[in-house]
Structure formats: structure tokens, C-alpha cells
Amino acid sequence: MGEIGAPARLLRHAELVSEAAENLLALLERERVALDAAWVRAGAALHDVGKIEHVGELSHPGALHEPAGERLLLAHGVAPHVARCCRSHAQWATLECALEELVVALADKLWKGARVPALEQRVIEAAAGRCARGVWDLFVPLDNGFEAIADAGPARIARSHVA
């Protein structure tokens, strides 16, 4: 993202969301849930790329960066399913999403310590479908893992400030 003008604050955010995504990938791997790790990694790194065009959304709420990011990535030849993470990370509640997209959306919450039960439930349900296990079989280990990732949120927030 640095090559296309991403400010340091956006790069740091992508780094911290990617850190949470790596923790989620490790958790899902421990539970033998099959997913496309490369998709999750790319989505976590690029989900807010549209904030290059909508810089005000780095410090204020807004959704203009979502479609802008998807368009920007598609224009640079990024695979459509990865580019879609620009929208699905924020619109997961209204879109049909693959597990990978839901993991990106969850990483974007957990990095700062935020728990979103409805999103976590969708991740658990999608993960159960991928590994042919019951939702309740996965609930406790995944919920405990989500809690551990969120618990590190304050430390990540402390590292989010750039000079």
C-alpha cells in the first residue's frame, strides 16, 4: 500500500489488523478449519485501502472508502474476492460472505479489543460448515480464542500511534 500513497497511520492499522488475522488463522488451524489463508492475509492488509482516497475516514467514521477500495484494488488487478473485503469487512451483516471475509471483518474488530457477538457467531457457523463439526463443538474453543485476541487489543492500540 505504501507504493500507492498510503499514509503511515493506514499502514500501521493494516499491520495490526493483520496481526489479529494471523492469530485467528492459527486458532482456526488448531481447530482444523480449512480456509484460504492467503485470502485472509491479503484482505486484512488491504481492507481499508480506500482510505487513501478518503483520508478523512482515517480519523472519522465513514463508508466511502469501502467501494472506493474495492474499485482501486480491481483497477490494480487484485482478485475480485480479495477486493470485495473492502466492502465485506464493514458490510458483513448484510452481505453473503465467505468464511475468509468474515475472518477479515473479525480481525478488524478484535485487533482493538472489540467483541461483536453477531459477527463471532457467523464466523463460528461458517467454520463449523467448513470442517463438518457442530457449532457447539467449535463454540468454546473459538470463543476462548476470540477473547484472547481481544484481550491483547489495548497493547495493539498502544502500538497504533505513529509519529
Model-derived regions: residue spans:
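Residue-level recognition of alpha-helical structural elements
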Residues: 6, 10, 35, 99, ...
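A positional/architectural concept
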Residues: 5, 9-29
